[in-house]
Regions:
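Bacterial Sec-dependent N-terminal signal peptides
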Residues: 1-60, 538
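Beta-strand-rich domains and repeat architectures in extracellular enzymes and scaffolds
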Residues: 64-102
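Repeated scaffold domains used in trafficking and secretory/extracellular systems
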Residues: 69-77, 122-131, 168-179, 215-224, ...
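Short beta-strand elements that form the blades of beta-propeller/WD-repeat-like
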Residues: 83-96, 134-144, 180-190, 197, ...
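Beta-propeller blade signature
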Residues: 101-109, 151-157, 198-201, 245-256, ...
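Blade-loop segments of beta-propeller domains
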Residues: 112-148, 161-174, 260-270, 423-427
Length: 538
């Protein structure tokens, strides 16, 4: 028989009162003993019946791809939300007539195959960048010795492929690649100056966007607004004498400059990065990081708005002003930092803390906007010129990145900070700089997850409160009695609803049958964060 908690609780209280009445007739000592016992039972009943706010990560479906030991292969995974996932196996064979072979497989949310496709690229063009929207995946290839490019377009619904060839004039080094409608937008450098060019799929013409090709400037980001049919360019001037400034320029589909929003240095504070969230037509909320002077080290988060050519006042939020920014530290160190901040305030000064941070795109929940930023620092190794050890070519080169902690902030629709939180990443290391922490919104809580050393780490928060501390989960193999000997290139993405996708490379052996040969596979795992009721939908 299933009864509600209220009914069960009322019956317990009724029995509790009757029991106390009986023991009252036996004396005070018996009454005290009865109350202690029944209070313990009441606590136990409440602990059992009150729903727990905890969950756990479970693996529901797994797909494996045998790795070809003969060819150089890479696995690329593109989550498509509720439309499924696209898996790209990139094969490189420099002795073949077509050295680059891209093989695509589209899966549904149950990881069942929907279609397969492939395209081949001959000698002379190297893979540069990719971009996808809801309809297509685009791959950009370029000839390092000429202006020739080719763009391969893959229809995500049918698997049909198309190659678009042409020449992109005025771009020597490509750093950003986006597509708006039937126009590709490439950002990069030409003769050491920043440039953004548009390439038409129809007439193969090239158009350079105005007001960008100038000295002492760098392109920070390139975005497209499909709904407004606009190209958005973030650039930062690097003039030390007059001060650095962030500028946002928005262009029409035909390349015409529509709006310019410049944010010059304000009290020695300059904006570093920016993420846009549309509010109304031609009106955006802008949130990003800012620094002191022209430094590349952030000392806080800023919030502002732009509407047409109008820029609204900027609100600055110092890291030291955030309630939980230093929660990633150990208690003793955190206490020392808080004492330092208090001393600075008594002296009438501000305590500044500077970090290199990577700001993610917004995650929109029903009630707020969530921003994730990760603190990192590059790792270097020195390359020595053996012929001349004193040569200027002996320079430190970036050899990967280490992440120290993640900052999570919640903003309302007007850009007001509602809460902040942070947690350590414990020196997570990657070869390339990119977002690591993935978040999934579930039942008014946020599941934070990131991969490390072939495992998945999770933490559950509700605003500034930690609901469940960090947990570590193994990425399981297909069969029992198997052991993972080696794991590499572990990646994770928030997929849809409460689901995550994990993928990477594993070398596996059987612990039951030693005669079975080891296998090397690319894997794709669907992970589910179980809800409070203990059930996980597939």
């Amino acid at each position: 028989m299933i009864v509600g908690f209220n009914t069960l609780f009322c019956e317990f209280v009724r029995s509790y009162n009757n029991l106390c009445l009986i023991f009252f007739t036996l004396g005070q000592e018996s009454l005290t003993y009865a109350m202690k016992k029944t209070n313990y039972l009441l606590f136990l009943l409440l602990w059992i019946t009150v729903p727990k706010a905890f969950g756990q990560l479970e693996q529901s479906i797994r797909v494996e791809f045998a790795k070809d030991a003969k060819d150089e292969e890479e696995l690329d995974v593109t989550p498509l939300e509720s439309e499924g996932v696209l898996v790209t196996v990139k094969k490189i064979d420099y002795f073949a007539s077509s050295p680059f072979v891209w093989k695509f497989t589209k899966y549904d949310t149950q990881l069942k195959e929907k279609w397969k496709a492939e395209f081949k690229v001959g000698f002379g063009k190297n893979p540069l960048l990719s971009y996808h929207n809801k309809q297509y995946l685009f791959w950009l290839f370029g000839d390092p010795d000429s202006d020739d490019i080719s763009i391969h377009r893959l229809d995500l619904s049918t698997g049909e492929t198309e190659e678009i060839e042409g020449q992109i004039l005025g771009v020597e080094v490509v750093s950003h690649f986006k597509v708006l409608g039937n126009t590709a937008i490439l950002a990069g450098k030409y003769r050491e100056k920043p440039v953004v060019a548009m390439f038409s799929f129809f007439d193969k013409s090239t158009k350079v966007l105005p007001a960008i090709y100038t000295s002492n400037m760098e392109i920070v980001d390139l975005e497209v607004d499909d709904e407004a049919q606009q190209v958005i360019v973030f650039s930062r001037s690097l003039k030390l004498k007059t001060g650095c400034q962030l500028t946002i320029r928005r262009y029409a589909y035909d390349g015409k400059l529509l709006f310019t929003n410049a944010f010059p240095a304000n009290e020695d504070r300059t904006l570093l990065t920016g993420k846009l969230m549309p509010i109304h037509p031609n009106e955006y909320l802008v949130i990003g990081s800012y620094a002191a002077s022209c430094s590349s080290y952030s000392q806080g988060i800023y919030v502002t708005k732009v509407k047409g050519d109008e820029s609204f006042p900027v609100k600055y939020i110092e890291f030291s002003e955030m309630a939980n920014f230093f929660n990633y530290m150990k208690p003793k160190r955190q206490q020392k930092i808080q004492e330092k901040i208090a001393r600075k305030k008594e002296e009438g000064k501000e305590a500044h803390f500077r970090y290199m941070i990577l700001v993610h795109d917004f995650v929109k929940t029903p009630d707020e906007l969530v921003l994730v930023a990760e603190s990192f620092y590059p790792q270097y190794h020195n390359t020595v010129n053996v012929v001349n050890p004193l040569s200027r070519s002996n320079a430190d080169r970036v050899n990967g990145f280490k992440y120290t902690h993640a900052l999570i902030c919640g903003f309302d629709k007007d850009g007001n900070l509602r809460w902040d939180n942070s947690f350590p990443l414990q020196d997570l290391e990657t070869n390339q700089l990119g977002p690591q922490v993935q978040i999934s919104y579930q039942q008014n809580r946020l599941v934070l997850a990131y991969p490390k050393e072939g495992k998945i780490n999770t933490q559950l928060i509700s605003g500034s409160k930690v609901v469940k501390e960090k947990e570590e989960f193994e990425v399981k193999t297909t069969y029992e009695n198997e052991k993972i000997l080696f794991a590499d290139n572990a990646s994770l993405a928030a997929w849809y609803d409460q689901y995550f996708l994990a993928w990477g490379f594993q070398k596996i052996e059987s612990t039951k049958d030693k005669n079975t040969s080891q296998r090397e596979v690319f894997y794709l795992n669907k992970l589910t964060y179980k809800s409070n009721d203990g059930r996980a939908k597939l």
